[in-house]
């Protein structure tokens, strides 16, 4: 009985830690850059769905574009201050629109997460959690699969992507080979390490660059294209994967090394900042109890066998106890330079991404029915 209580208590701590109010602060010495106040911060509702996870601007600087929980990709019209439909990730749209719990239908309707434009063609590439790696032309519409069917079906949880503008190579992540997005808490609790970093090149070949990753998430190419930064959410760290073996500058395992670790929360997406370095969205802060739970995966696996809907538990808790933030890391050493977080009543449920464009921070969250816009 005592062992069962320990399992339940620790598992609840792990679930709640995704929104833990006692989260630890940054350890890299960054000062808080922004204390968000309502007059400074604009919330932009995403009509009909929620979860603007990631942002991207097109070749002309228009947008941003973002994917939503009902499978749509929408475009922001700045002059009209409204979103318009741009694309969908599947033509099977029956039952996808309108107010309902989209998590129950996202495996049918699609859930677009990472987005990136191929600037040479104008095509928008999409990492859809269920439909795999997709693309749609400059005028939008229904996206089509990029990979052969058998390869696309092998992707269990396509999450993020980036494109080399010089070569057209697409780098993308598959968060788990076991768990799908609608049960991502299971991947976190179980200690799953089946995530992969992959690439799709001009010869239409798919290559696995890294495997055995713990909930691999965001990916970003460096400014000069010599390395990738890859987020391991469950490990609260970021890896640097060198694309050119001659570029390795330190003692690393194979051709990757730890770029940043001990982050103050669970990292999600990562994007380059035009001011240098990388913005990392931290879904939520964590605590010492979180670290204990994450380092004892057997507890989480045991809890998954209990008759509890852990996704529902997490969803309800997160709704009322948000604690998201974002950090900007230095390009060379991964040191925290700036911190973005709300204060008091303006705390975020979660932050999945910060995209910086023309002096504005676009803030995304997989859980909210709005995007945030902050003028620096």
From Swiss-Prot:
Gene3D superfamilies per record: TolB, C-terminal domain
Keywords: Glycoprotein, Signal, Vacuole
Keyword Translocase annotated: no
One cellular component term from this protein's GO annotations in UniProt: vacuole
Localization terms from the record: Vacuole
Signal peptide from the UniProt entry: 1-23
KW Metal-binding (keyword) present: no
Major localization class: other
Glycosylated residues (UniProt): 79, 244
Disulphide-bonded residues: none
Family classification: Belongs to the strictosidine synthase family.
Annotated PANTHER family: PROTEIN STRICTOSIDINE SYNTHASE-LIKE 2 (PTHR10426:SF79), STRICTOSIDINE SYNTHASE-RELATED (PTHR10426)
Identification of the protein by name: Protein STRICTOSIDINE SYNTHASE-LIKE 2
Protein's organism: Arabidopsis thaliana
